[in-house]
């Protein structure tokens, strides 16, 4: 559902539906010069950036050129490990080998705690006061800010509106029963309802399973209980519900989901072979690259027949950029981060090139800027119909354990009881 009227993504709007507002004034790129960068001295320094968002690689490399024109004494070395690769393992290898980056990605919450002894306090940076509260939360501890959120993202089912209309589906499903009814209607017009990239561990172990956690009565208490041994995944109703959804997508999906990667399911969707895929609003640019101006939208993943509970989208910060406190180039790293969110060039790339939902109140965007998917996500945020993303609260390595257990369930190697036990065993092995 595309809104034609311009929308300012501001903290004032978010205040009414999520948290109390935080104020902020516009900054300019000139602020960054006050951070002690090498830009005004003769010394040339290199800032090594190690991040995982593969969909922004082209844009980052273009911004690197523009930034280095403005700051000729700062050179950016940008490396990306993402997609199907294990970024967390690669980051640990970087630090262990003595090739630690100056800027790297961090998911916040438990991941912030894990890397706490490497994180520079960024509380004094000019952009901090402009953070939207929802976006600031994952990297805030004891009133201090340790990371710059790249954007807000929503995760759900991306769907082809034209195929839905052709199949006679007039409303997006809000229950698992309605979802199956929609799938049957799509099959009736010879369209594969779901494209499932279940080869991808992150799609299952980070994004998909987040819904089963988010729908707990109190997710933070549940996670604390898992760590303390007072709560369990085994026999938990929400996990059974989620497995029912998983089985439904396999039943109405393409063949061989466990050997289908994200690029394939994106291509199948963009070419009209499938009507739905589990994705986030970052898929907008990826779909546009294959089929420009495709009529698409997003809705939450319903795991049962509680329409009110299911009509909430998983929304949060996918990644924060943090600064290595031991870096010899940390002031230059701060200069780049500030430039990224305060310069006209940086802000343009954030909303127009990457179609990001901004995490700062000083970055304006319209639905036309952020695309149909971003506009749908923002509508859920405005209406207060959101669940937070949960994976950053998990013990390190659990997401891969989860994915392995889920893939065993899909393959039929375990039944539901065995799957739940496998999920619990993965948590117990890695909890602290």
Residue positions per predicted region:
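Glycine-centered hinge/linker elements that transmit conformational signals in sensory
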Residues: 185, 228-258, 424
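Extracytoplasmic/periplasmic substrate-recognition and gating elements
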Residues: 69-70, 75, 167, 289-353
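Conserved C-terminal helix/tail region of periplasmic/extracytoplasmic solute-binding proteins
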Residues: 165, 364, 380-432
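Conserved N-terminal structural module of periplasmic/extracytoplasmic solute-binding proteins
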Residues: 4-7, 22-111, 118, 171, ...
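Short, solvent-exposed loop/beta-turn-alpha elements that line the ligand-binding surface or hinge
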Residues: 121-137, 214-241, 289-291, 303-312, ...
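Extracytoplasmic/periplasmic solute-binding protein
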Residues: 146-148, 155, 180-231
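A structural signal for short loop-to-beta-strand junctions that line the ligand-binding cleft
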Residues: 102, 129-164, 192-196, 309-313, ...
């Amino acid at each position: 559902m595309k809104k034609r009227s311009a929308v300012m993504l501001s903290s004032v709007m978010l205040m009414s539906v999520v948290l109390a507002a935080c104020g902020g004034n516009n900054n300019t790129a000139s602020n960054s010069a006050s951070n002690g960068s090498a830009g005004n001295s003769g010394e040339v320094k290199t800032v090594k950036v190690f991040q995982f968002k593969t969909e922004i690689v082209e844009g980052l490399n273009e911004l690197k050129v523009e930034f280095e024109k403005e700051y000729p004494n700062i050179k950016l070395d940008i490396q990306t490990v993402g997609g199907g690769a294990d970024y967390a393992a690669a980051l640990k290898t970087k630090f262990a080998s003595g090739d630690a980056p100056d800027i790297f990605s961090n998911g916040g919450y438990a991941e912030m705690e894990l890397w706490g002894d490497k994180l520079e306090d960024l509380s004094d940076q000019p952009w901090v006061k402009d953070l939207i509260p929802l976006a600031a939360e994952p990297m805030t501890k004891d009133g201090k800010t340790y990371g710059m959120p790249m954007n807000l993202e929503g995760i759900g089912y991306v769907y082809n509106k034209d195929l839905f209309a052709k199949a006679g589906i007039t409303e997006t499903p809000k229950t698992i029963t309605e979802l199956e009814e929609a799938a049957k209607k799509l099959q009736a017009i010879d369209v594969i309802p779901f494209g499932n990239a279940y080869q991808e561990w992150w799609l299952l172990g980070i994004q998909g399973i987040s819904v089963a956690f988010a729908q707990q009565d109190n997710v933070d208490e549940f996670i604390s209980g898992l760590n303390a041994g007072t709560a369990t995944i085994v026999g938990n109703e929400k996990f059974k519900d989620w497995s029912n959804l998983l089985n439904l997508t396999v039943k109405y999906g393409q063949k061989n989901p466990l050997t289908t990667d994200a690029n394939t399911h994106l291509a199948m969707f963009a070419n009209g072979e499938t009507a739905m895929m589990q994705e986030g609003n970052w898929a907008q640019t990826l779909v546009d690259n294959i089929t420009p101006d495709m009529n698409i939208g997003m809705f939450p993943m319903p795991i049962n027949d509680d329409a009110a509970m299911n009509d909430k989208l998983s929304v949060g910060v996918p990644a924060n950029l943090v600064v290595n406190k031991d870096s010899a180039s940390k002031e230059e790293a701060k200069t780049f981060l500030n430039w990224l969110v305060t310069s006209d060039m940086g802000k343009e790339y954030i909303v127009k090139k990457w179609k990001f939902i901004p995490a700062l109140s000083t970055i304006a965007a319209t639905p036309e800027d952020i695309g149909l998917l971003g506009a749908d996500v923002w509508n859920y945020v405005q209406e207060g119909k959101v669940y937070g993303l949960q994976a950053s609260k998990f013990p390190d390595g659990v997401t891969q354990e989860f994915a392995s257990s889920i893939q065993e369930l899909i393959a039929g190697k375990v039944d539901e009881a065995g799957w739940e036990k496998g999920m619990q065993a993965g948590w117990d092995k890695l909890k602290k």
